């Protein structure tokens, strides 16, 4: 007798390696939606069906179906793209992607509001410049993060190459994507084979990051799988491997955020074998009945870390060496020009909540379009939703900086903003309980007023906001975070550290804006008066006993 499984597992099994009935759904002109089963399969192709929640009430009154649109996400390993690719990305956003473009916390880009009839055109448009959307969503490995640090550029290039190789190695092998979206023909030669994923892929999504100490921009311990580079000078000698990090699910007490456990050290040549072994261990042992318990962290909690490590070693044919000493001492994007080891320059542009748009009072898409037309290097999306104009030769600096200033992409370097981010939330995310992206700028402005009041305007504080507990902006590592609870109400989370390897904890629940700001005002006043030299806000909150550190999240996160 077979074990019970979630309906999504049956949908994947009968999808014929992710084909489903997507062609039929796309051809159905009577609705702006795709079939319910295809909404699960479409995720593997990089897009989600959504509806515009600001229009939900009015549509039925007009005897209309919901205003359906699609969010399409395209992975860019390490967030790197060329100027030619950027111009194509921008063009698709302006023409078919709702007139905007969003940089994500996972160094990808995504469009919102694509109509069903335009999905194929968008996919073909980005494919023309060698970008695809397969694996942008779904129960597979998502975009692989890589530290965009331009200072240690020789080491960064080597680590970035490994991030690309991990990404390519863990891609689905099905031909369905090319058949449906690109050439329109089913390729002969027998059934697809998925050597890593199998017919039902993973129980849930899977996220991987590659970090370069001392900078933890990628939040390496907040990922299912993490590789922290270990270097001898500028030479990569291996990685400390970690597994089992991520956030939690909405309204389910049995779920909890968790930092990844360190499995040990491996040499670079073992990297792909270890990555595959962790993925296949999760494929085999992950929960396929309860999707709220299906992430890798819960698999490790059930198996125990030692048993999980043994299984990964067996599958990879390796033995982990003891983890090497490393230190994450920094995070956040650097402002101003930074010179790389190759003599070229890198400029980080501030993109509020990752949103690029042309409209009243802002023209960020146009500004980047003009920069891309003259830029000879590349662009790098950061895990903080900002954008690095990378590898600029000395003679090109002045023109690029002038364009950045003209279009308001510089001079926003207030410490609080550069260390903050938010998820999309309303009106497009179906899970959002409260505003995030649309409210975050106003919230930050009010917190900035409080930091100035207490003489803390130059103090970095990692601040994040999400519209629901799922935590797409990784709020559970922030020093100060708001997690949506309901319309206009948030849980106030406190106590992460500035280097992003300590979980925060619920401080106050279900607060409105006035109550949140009153709490922050009091806390900032205490911090300004009582902090020790060099002490960060989150560290002070722990030292002073305002919040207790989370030691074992499975047991004490909800206390």
Curated annotation (Swiss-Prot):
Cofactor: siroheme; [4Fe-4S] cluster
The keyword DNA repair appears for this protein: no
Binding site for siroheme: 472
Sequence positions that bind [4Fe-4S] cluster: 423, 429, 468, 472
This enzyme's EC code(s): 1.8.1.2
Endoplasmic reticulum found in the keyword field: no
One Pfam assignment: NIR_SIR_ferr
Cofactor note: Binds 1 siroheme per subunit.
Keywords carried by this UniProt record: 4Fe-4S, Amino-acid biosynthesis, Cysteine biosynthesis, Heme, Iron, Iron-sulfur, Metal-binding, NADP, Oxidoreductase
Pathway entry: Sulfur metabolism; hydrogen sulfide biosynthesis; hydrogen sulfide from sulfite (NADPH route): step 1/1
GO terms of biological process kind: cysteine biosynthetic process; hydrogen sulfide biosynthetic process; sulfate assimilation
GO molecular function: 4 iron, 4 sulfur cluster binding; heme binding; metal ion binding; NADP binding; sulfite reductase (ferredoxin) activity; sulfite reductase (NADPH) activity
GO cellular component, as recorded: sulfite reductase complex (NADPH)
Catalysed reactions listed for this entry: hydrogen sulfide + 3 NADP(+) + 3 H2O = sulfite + 3 NADPH + 4 H(+)
Family: Belongs to the nitrite and sulfite reductase 4Fe-4S domain family.
Protein purpose: Component of the sulfite reductase complex that catalyzes the 6-electron reduction of sulfite to sulfide. This is one of several activities required for the biosynthesis of L-cysteine from sulfate.
Subunit description: Alpha(8)-beta(8). The alpha component is a flavoprotein, the beta component is a hemoprotein.
Name by which UniProt lists this protein: Sulfite reductase [NADPH] hemoprotein beta-component
